[in-house]
A protein has these predicted regions:
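Amphipathic, interaction-prone secondary-structure segments
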Residues: 29-52
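Charged, amphipathic alpha-helical segments and their flanking helix caps
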Residues: 1-23, 45-148
Length: 148
């Protein structure tokens, strides 16, 4: 699996994400439909960080992850903030995850060396009415190496 597929799988397998019923999508979600409890994983681009004398390349990719949640009362919003905090702690402890990338038509092995998550916040109220559900965002950065 490449780095994008791997991040989707990490989120799908995360016990904190059980309530989303495997509704985790890449570059899509039905914004504001709290009945669906969707999550959208949006890759924001990959940057080459460095290379070494052996030909290994270090990259960094950022993601925005959006999740629909109910937010009727302060209790719900506090619970949502706690969810984002727990997800941040969960993701930040992950490392050394094997990946495979297709580079110029050739399959290359690699490893995720670090995942950093943060900036979890209430992103939008899609319908304009907080009682219809809201969308939260968390940002994820992934550092990884592709071996020659």
């Amino acid at each position: 699996m490449n780095v994008i597929e791997t991040i989707k799988k990490i989120l799908t397998d995360c016990p904190l994400m059980d309530e989303f019923n495997n509704n985790i999508h890449i570059d899509y979600m039905s914004l504001g439909d709290v009945k669906e409890m969707d999550t959208g994983v949006y890759p924001l681009g990959t940057s080459l960080v460095s290379g070494d004398i052996l030909g290994n390349k270090k990259y960094h990719i950022n993601f925005s992850v959006f999740a629909d949640r109910k937010a009727y009362e302060d209790y719900d919003r506090l619970n949502n903030s706690g969810f984002l905090l727990s997800l941040t702690y969960y993701l930040n402890q992950l490392k050394d995850i094997a990946i495979t990338e297709n580079v110029n038509g050739e399959e290359k092995n690699g490893v995720i060396t670090k995942i950093s998550a943060g900036n979890g916040l209430l992103f939008s109220v899609p319908s304009g009415d907080i009682n219809d559900g809201v969308t939260y965002q968390i940002q994820i950065g992934v550092s990884y190496t592709i071996f020659k």
